[in-house]
């Protein structure tokens, strides 16, 4: 295969994933409830946009009406602009209770001109402590960008603009719990965490810049729900059809994953010797792609 045909294959792959992730945007009125923050959360533009705001009194949040058990979840976000130090925008899947499962994106704000930190984590049966953190290769406050979670029985894939940044593989054979039996809702919140979010809490929230606002659009869930079974779009992605690339990593996807982790990962619990002086958690052996 020559260079031109290789490039064509790569472009086609990216296009297929992009189409799968964005062609079925849903209405926020139909899919979500604003759960806290009084009127600081808003759904507008006919249900095509949602915003969360934070001031010195309160933050705000929302959750999905449906519970999901496996699927691909896409959301476009534009994060708090300017001096966002001390703020956290969280976007995640979670069940409830002491033994809950959870799949996290958390965006840790920073001082003007300094990069956001994207914090990821996976909880299974109430246990987390599986953090990986990244800088982004763009300014997430200037435009909307797509943040996706692919949740399958075999693995969880975190994607940013359809580029994989993290894979958490099922390592139950090694005795590691994996989220696979508890349906989860989608949650998001914007809140003050200046006791830890920016430089370990050294930089506090500048309330003179409030209200802080994050924006959402382009939600899509090609998924299985606890109440009505599997979306046909997600079912087709399990088969041999052209959409399989949307829930699996091909060779190009694995190369892009390695690129992100080489140049933009700033913390990986699987390489933290101070935290695990007696050996890394067993799932770390399966974390390489």
Curated annotation (Swiss-Prot):
Family label: Belongs to the glycosyl hydrolase 16 family. XTH group 2 subfamily.
User: Effect of gene disruption?
Assistant: No visible growth defects, but increased aluminum resistance.
What is known about its induction? Down-regulated by auxin. Down-regulated by aluminum. Repressed by far-red light (FRc).
Gene3D superfamilies in alphabetical order: 2.60.120.200
pH and activity: Optimum pH is 6 for the XET activity.
Instruction: Provide the protein name.
Output: Xyloglucan endotransglucosylase/hydrolase protein 15
The SS bond pairs are: 224-230, 270-284
According to the UniProt entry, where is the signal peptide? Answer: 1-25
Question: What biological process terms from GO does the record include?
Answer: cell wall biogenesis; cell wall organization; response to far red light; xyloglucan metabolic process
Q: What does this protein do?
A: Catalyzes xyloglucan endohydrolysis (XEH) and/or endotransglycosylation (XET). Cleaves and religates xyloglucan polymers, an essential constituent of the primary cell wall, and thereby participates in cell wall construction of growing tissues. Has a high XET activity, but little or no XEH activity in vitro. Acceptor preferences are XXXGol > XLLGol = XLFGol > XXLGol > XXFGol.
- According to its UniProt record, where is this protein located? Secreted, Cell wall; Secreted, Extracellular space, Apoplast
Q: What is its EC number?
A: 2.4.1.207, 3.2.1.151
Domain of life assignment = Eukaryota
Q: What InterPro entries does the record tag this protein with? A: Beta-glucanase/XTH, ConA-like_dom_sf, GH16, GH16_AS, XET_C, XTH
In this chain, the site described as Important for catalytic activity is at 104
Q: Which UniProt keywords apply?
A: Apoplast, Cell wall, Cell wall biogenesis/degradation, Disulfide bond, Glycoprotein, Glycosidase, Hydrolase, Secreted, Signal, Transferase
GO CC terms on record?
apoplast
Tissues where this protein is expressed = Strongly expressed in roots, hypocotyls and cotyledons. Aslo detected in inflorescence stems and in the carpels and styles in flowers.
Which residues have a glycan attached per UniProt? 110
Residue ranges constituting the GH16 domain according to the UniProt record: 26-216
Name the reaction it catalyses: breaks a beta-(1->4) bond in the backbone of a xyloglucan and transfers the xyloglucanyl segment on to O-4 of the non-reducing terminal glucose residue of an acceptor, which can be a xyloglucan or an oligosaccharide of xyloglucan; xyloglucan + H2O = xyloglucan oligosaccharides
GO MF terms, alphabetically ordered: polysaccharide binding; xyloglucan-specific endo-beta-1,4-glucanase activity; xyloglucan:xyloglucosyl transferase activity
UniProt-annotated catalytic positions: 102 (nucleophile), 106 (proton donor)
Task: Kindly give the SUPFAM superfamilies that the UniProt entry links to this protein.
Answer: Concanavalin A-like lectins/glucanases (SSF49899)
Please tell me where xyloglucan binds in this chain.
106, 119-121, 129-131, 195-196, 200, 275
Which post-translational modifications are recorded for this protein? Contains at least one intrachain disulfide bond essential for its enzymatic activity.
């Amino acid at each position: 295969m020559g260079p031109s045909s290789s490039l064509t294959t790569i472009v086609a792959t990216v296009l297929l994933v992009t189409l799968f992730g964005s062609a079925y945007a849903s209405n926020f009125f139909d899919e979500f409830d604003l759960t806290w923050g009084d009127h600081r959360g808003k759904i507008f533009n006919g249900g095509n946009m949602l915003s969360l705001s934070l001031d010195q009194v309160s933050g705000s949040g929302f959750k999905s009406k449906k519970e999901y058990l496996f699927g691909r979840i896409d959301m476009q976000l534009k994060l708090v602009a300017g001096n966002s130090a001390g703020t956290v925008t969280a976007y995640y899947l979670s069940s409830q209770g002491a033994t809950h499962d959870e799949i996290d994106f958390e965006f840790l704000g920073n001082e003007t001109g300094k990069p956001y930190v994207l914090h990821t984590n996976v909880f299974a049966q109430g246990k987390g402590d599986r953090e990986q953190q990244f800088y982004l290769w763009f300014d997430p406050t200037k435009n909307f960008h797509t943040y996706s979670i692919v949740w399958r029985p075999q693995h969880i894939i975190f994607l940013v603009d359809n580029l994989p940044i993290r894979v958490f593989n099922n390592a139950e054979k090694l005795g590691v719990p994996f989220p696979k039996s508890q349906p989860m809702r989608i949650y998001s919140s914007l809140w003050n965490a200046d006791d830890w979010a920016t430089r370990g809490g050294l930089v506090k929230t500048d309330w003179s810049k409030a209200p802080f606002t994050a924006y959402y659009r382009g939600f899509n869930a090609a998924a299985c729900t606890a109440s009505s079974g599997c979306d046909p779009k997600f079912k087709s992605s399990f088969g041999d059809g052209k959409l399989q690339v949307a829930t699996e990593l091909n060779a190009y996807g694995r190369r892009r994953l390695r690129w992100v982790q080489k140049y933009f990962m700033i913390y990986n619990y699987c390489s933290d010797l101070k935290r695990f002086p007696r050996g890394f958690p067993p799932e770390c052996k399966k974390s390489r792609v």
